[in-house]
Amino acid sequence: EAGEECDCGSPANPCCDAATCKLRPGAQCADGLCCDQCRFIKKGTVCRPARGDWNDDTCTGQSADCPRNGLYG
């Protein structure tokens, strides 16, 4: 939602302050296929394996999202 950096619905998330819905100090992310232990996963790490004629989708190192590369193998 607007103004939220993370989903504050779960107080158990160590990356997100449930009271403010903001990332905790030092955290880059709180969830996502390219987020691990509150940090972005390094560039080139497979976040979604190849399927059919499509290549692997990989993390960018700049975001917690796993972008679709849109490339055929």
Swiss-Prot record:
GO molecular function: toxin activity
Coiled coil regions in record: none
Tissue expression from the record: Expressed by the venom gland.
Pfam (any one): Disintegrin
Disintegrin domain location: 1-73
Record's keyword annotation contains Isomerase: no
Cysteines engaged in disulfide bonds, as pairs: 6-21, 8-16, 15-38, 29-35, 34-59, 47-66
Keyword Disulfide bond on entry: yes
Keywords attached to this entry: Cell adhesion impairing toxin, Disulfide bond, Hemostasis impairing toxin, Platelet aggregation inhibiting toxin, Secreted, Toxin
SMART domains with a match to the protein in the record: DISIN
Residues that span the membrane, as ranges: none
PANTHER family on file: ADAM A DISINTEGRIN AND METALLOPROTEASE DOMAIN, ADAM METALLOPROTEASE
Annotated protein name in UniProt: Disintegrin mojastin-2
Upper taxonomic lineage: Eukaryota, Metazoa, Chordata, Craniata, Vertebrata
